[in-house]
């Protein structure tokens, strides 16, 4: 859908307002009247831009997914066949930053799959499949060549991603558990060390203990 240039700023404002409210309240918990109020327009004007509420939801999700791609250093590590001790910290750096810098995106994806499941896979596939497919291929290669334990690469791909998204919230539900980390750099180290300890075969892990400790990649 395209709009006259003079209206594009207003449309962007509507989409931004919708993303905020849908992420906070869910799809069914958000009304177009609330979105119009937050965007400082009338509800009639909103419907001139978006005929249906669902159209606005998908526009807001696409706006948050736009530009999401693997970073250059991570892509290079994957394509060059760098070891897991190099690539996993790079992967966790991107996952942690996404969780911190794009919190609305994660909530919108959850809302899409819970409340609008019939189209969620199609929209998310367009943007997320290239990312997860590249990571999955890398993990599969390293499983095949013995650098990682023999596990299902697709399950591992899902586990790596969801651990970053879910672990901080689960920790809050465990009585007496300390905060999992103090900042994003420590978070990258925590997840990298944990998963390398879990995934690297014992004989390779012994060799890794002689190498410098895993740190977050430079910003």
Q: For each predicted feature, which ranges?
A:
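C-terminal peripheral helix-coil segments that are non-catalytic and often amphipathic
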Residues: 1, 86, 93-97, 101, ...
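Short hydrophobic clusters on alpha-helical segments that form packing/core surfaces
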Residues: 14-22, 95, 195
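Generic hydrophobic, amphipathic alpha-helix propensity
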Residues: 10-18, 35, 60-64, 68, ...
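Amphipathic alpha-helical linker/stalk segments
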Residues: 60-91, 138-143
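Membrane-interface starts of transmembrane alpha-helices
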Residues: 149, 153-157
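Helix-turn-helix
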Residues: 13, 21-55, 59-60
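Short coil/turn segments at alpha/beta junctions that flank glycine-rich nucleotide-binding fingerprints
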Residues: 24-28, 102, 145
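Short secondary-structure transition hinges
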Residues: 86, 97-134, 155, 178-181
